[in-house]
Amino acid sequence: MSVVLLVRHAQASFLEPNYDKLSKLGEAQTHLLGEYWVRHKIVFDRACTGPRVRQRDTLSIASDACRKAGVPFPGPLVLPEFDEYQGEAVLEKSLPGLLTTDQSIRDLHSAFESSSGSAERRATFSKLFEAVIGKWVRGTTCPPGVETWLEFCSRVNSGLTKFLSAGSRGERVAIVTSGGPIAVAMQRALQLSAESTLNVSWMSRNSSWSEFIYSGERFTLSSFNCHAHIDDGAMLTYR
């Protein structure tokens, strides 16, 4: 049996012009993750990451903390299969049409547009984003040029099969990715519905990990959304 840790990237720059960049808090979160691996003597045989800067930098900072402490860390692969779904594109291309046909979306959009202050803007945007993504998952909105939910799930599952099958028995591997791919892994392990999978995706905290046991076709959940490396509750974030 082998073990894979799927790690969600640390906090990115939410509602900033360039989201795909770790915040200062995100950098601190992932440094703590690396230190946790060192303290608990967690050593990986292989590692990979999705292609996004926030994913690659999360692994880079954590692995640097390991190496500085004298703990070996494998050079990572970068696999596009572990990219997040195209949430920004779904929102951008779906919103104009939904604003003309869906009162609930109009209300959520109006609440976001009239919000002020960082906390309120985060909360109102999250509600709008989750509502639009929910429609995409259910197939209510299918913007052209954007992969469907089923295509996204197929991509992630293909990546899991490719990366995990390339190893050997008894190894421990790490995959740094995003909340969506981690939820697809949960779906794979627990046979979740699309709606439940989406709900799970909102639960992953930044820099948390979920552990799975695998061998051949067997893929079993061991733990979900662990963040034992963070003691300060103020450092726990979803976005």
Locate each region found by the language model.
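Acidic, low-complexity terminal tails and accessory targeting/binding regions
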Residues: 2, 68, 85-106, 112, ...
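Loop-to-helix element that buttresses phosphate recognition and phosphoryl-transfer chemistry
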Residues: 3, 10-64, 76, 148-155
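Beta-strand elements within well-structured catalytic alpha/beta cores of enzymes
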Residues: 3-7, 48, 171-177
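Conserved beta-strand termini and adjacent loop/short-helix elements that scaffold enzyme active sites
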Residues: 7, 79-81, 224
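Active-site metal-binding loops of divalent metal-dependent hydrolases
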Residues: 10, 179-180, 225-227
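Phosphate-coordination/substrate-recognition cap region in phosphate-metabolizing enzymes
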Residues: 35-125
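Short, well-ordered beta-to-alpha junction loops that form the rim of enzyme active sites
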Residues: 51-52, 81, 173-180
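Hydrophobic, aromatic-enriched interface-forming segments
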Residues: 116-167, 177
